[in-house]
Amino acid sequence: MAKPRVHEIAAEIGVDSKTALAKLKEMGEFVKGPSSSIEPPVARKLKAALEAAGLTGQAAAPAAAPSSAPRPGARSSAPKPGGRPTPGPQPTAAPEVEAPEASDVPVPAKPLTVAERQAQAEASRKAAAEEKAQAEKSAASATPDAPAAETPSAPRPDAGSAPAPSNGIPRPGIPRPAAPRPGNNPFASNQGMGTKPRPGNNPFASNQGMGQRPAAGAAGPRPAAPRPGSPRPGAPRPGGVGQGARPAGFGQRPAGAGRPGGAPGGAGRPGAPAAGGFQRPAGGFAGRPGGGGRGRGPGGGTAGAFGRGGGKSKSRKSKRTKRAEFELREAPSLGGVSVPRGDGNTIVRLRRGASISDFADKIDASPGNLVTVLFHLGEMATATESLDEATFEVLGTELGYKIQVVSPEDEDRELLEGFDIDLDQELEDEDDDVLEIRPPVVTVMGHVDHGKTRLLDAIRNANVIEGEAGGITQHIGAYQVWAPHEGYERAITFIDTPGHEAFTAMRARGAQVTDIAILVVAADDGIMPQTVEALNHAQAANVPIVVAVNKVDKEGANPAKVRQQLTEYGLVAEEYGGDVMFVDVSALTGKGVEDLLEAVLLTADAGLDLRSNPNKDARGVAIEARLDKGRGAVATVLIQSGTLRVGDAIVAGTAYGRVRAMMDENGDAVHEAYPSRPVQVQGLSSVPGAGDTFLVTEEDRTARQIAEKREAVERNAQLAKARKRISLEDFTRALEEGKVESLNLIIKGDVSGAVEALEESLMKIEVDDSVQLRIIHRGVGAVTESDVNLATIDNAIIIGFNVRPDPKARARAAREGVDIRFYSVIYSALEEIESSLTGMLKPEFEEVQSGVAEIREVFRSSKFGNIAGVIVRSGTITRNAKARVIRDGVVVGDSLAIESLRRFKDDVSEVRTDFEAGIGLGKFNDIQIGDEIETIEMKEKPRV
């Protein structure tokens, strides 16, 4: 859909474009001008903000009021100047004599009463309707009607001569000093344009879409005005003192034969109700009932009578433009460039992964100048490179802007609003009569190995734990079971989350989609770190908690201790006067399972309103997703509202498609899935991320467009996240010392949640600043040949989590020497990767003393310099070893080398303790008897 422009929105609401631009700036949305286009969500926010501020319709009202005000005013005051001496018989050569009279006449004008103003407004509306009808007629047929319309003004002697120039062409032959030549007036109707000027040539005409201009000053230049500064006698001044209500248009001065230089004729009276669009007796343009004074109003001065146009001078700039240019000149420049600066509180909203070009568009600056500024701030980036929030904070602080990076939730909400999809509004608009009761969604949480999956096995009468590697849940499982309650079979949806510390994100996701949380605590272990974390997730999601004290049949079990420990975290058992239900269970024997289900249903009925609308398109969450070799992308989704049917067009995160098939947790086909029902969906184009929202759209095209936009947003966010910030100092140091060692990884897993958990855990490994971990690709499914090619180019290691490579990938990896490692337990992968990073560290060396020799004699040689005769006191002195000379405990020579080592006349490689030798230290000759020569070795220090 086409994006709306600012001036279109302003016209629709009825405000001025400047007001709309100012409101956009307050909202943090900076656009260049009224013709700039904005996103539909921003347009809706702008309309809401203007309506909330009460600004709608303020631009249209001032435009309409002045347009009608001059006519009634001129009409009511028309009889007053009628008593003046008739100016018709005056000589043609003396038009200036009337100027003093005209300036003196407006004095007796008196203010209008409220009744008169209302009558004038009614008359102006009638006149406007008649003007529209008369504008459709030709000038020849319109002129004879003018005298009849001006019967109230019959006493004016020039009324009878008004029809003379009805053809609208002023005669050049008449000696009128102030009348321009026909070719001098570009706005006159006698320029070969027939009876009416062409709309496109007249920027002041009423049909130019400029209705917001005050009509009182729109007449502009007047071709037959001999007195440029004379106001209309007796006419009101709607624009204040500076804008006189001059007779409307060029046609107000017919310049007939009987009026060589006289006042306006009766046919063009601005206040006449039947003037009908102003007959243009002197070649004016229609529909503009009033002109501004000399340079005092929107209509301009009388300069237009001499062919220069009556508009505002082009060389003059508005105060706003001058102020902006002055601020730009006075703004301090960084790096020799000038950029617009904020006041320190100017908010700029940017999407995740935005570039310098995006920031430049927001503040109306040049991207190249911003790149220069950023370079002088110590950051190197290109104009189109995705930057992180910290970099924008540095740049915004320097330029006086507050940077607000849109959160992923708000970004996705605005994206959907662009397709007229508002999930929150849908929920608010639902009435109680369309809501139906749905089953509760229960998440099982707790510490690792406390028996969560075993408890679910006991509830489902199945054995899930045998399918998990190492007995640790690696995925989120979703099941629906039926339990008897008060004589009825009630459905309960269970979500099993991992308890290992690596699966923090998956636990948080489980808490966000659940209604009730079952906190499983082992009676023998008590409270553990992941127990507290799961408790915090549930409390943050404002989810009621039911505590299942497991393993009560085990030796050393102490359920009372668990109750006491949880009291410290705000969970007080009912038997202690609290409101949290504690149930003692044994997943191994099945004891207390029925009591636990009853506690869940009682909690759901007591404090939760579990209702949703099943009669609409489905909305929900993708709990888990994987890539199946035979079925393609398979996503486990939980329907939160609506009904999902086979054949629906669906979009989940960056994946889209049609629902080809649905199955429950047992593999049985499902044709319709109602709220709170977990199903496995086939038919998606790719594997969605765990926790992505899904929704049903009317068309495949809409689903594809939403997915593509989400993919672009996610790609930019990943680029900004992967960018390593490097300053100029770091860059110089890297050039001198060599590049930083990095371990490149490619992660492939069976489900998206496990890949995400593994990636987050790996990125938390901190070994040393000299070694960094880079994940260049992650995905769901088997290791493919393209993964091996990518690993070959980037020297990466491929980590497969519960997946295996296909034959071609295995053969290519063997041929290229790519290391592929497979894991089924997540912490095994973490330990090995950490060991690999430790092995990549540069070795650390420490000084170790290898020997000490005392100088007994100094032999001086002209060929070899001074030779030290020594006796080895400790250790071993070796040739070419590093040495230092120590005198009275002070080092007098360092970084030396033992270049020659002899015993008597024989060269030797080493001399042991208590043996004598001769040592030559090269060019170092500052040795004395009693000095010590200490030799050292650099040995590698083992990493801890």
From Swiss-Prot:
Q: Which residues bind GTP?
A: 446-453, 496-500, 550-553
Biased composition range(s): Low complexity? 55-81, 93-107, 136-153, 211-222, 244-257, 270-283
Where can this protein be found? Cytoplasm
- Output compositional bias ranges, type Basic and acidic residues: 123-135
Cite the Gene3D superfamilies for this sequence.
1.10.10.2480, P-loop containing nucleotide triphosphate hydrolases, Translation factors, Translation initiation factor IF- 2, domain 3
The UniProt regions of compositional bias labelled Gly residues, in chain numbering, are: 258-269, 284-310
Q: What is its main location?
A: cytoplasm
Q: Which PANTHER family match?
A: TR-TYPE G DOMAIN-CONTAINING PROTEIN, TRANSLATION INITIATION FACTOR IF-2-RELATED
Q: What job does this protein perform?
A: One of the essential components for the initiation of protein synthesis. Protects formylmethionyl-tRNA from spontaneous hydrolysis and promotes its binding to the 30S ribosomal subunits. Also involved in the hydrolysis of GTP during the formation of the 70S ribosomal complex.
Q: Can you say what this protein is called?
A: Translation initiation factor IF-2
Source organism of the structure: Clavibacter michiganensis subsp. michiganensis (strain NCPPB 382)
Q: What is the lineage of its organism?
A: Bacteria, Bacillati, Actinomycetota, Actinomycetes, Micrococcales
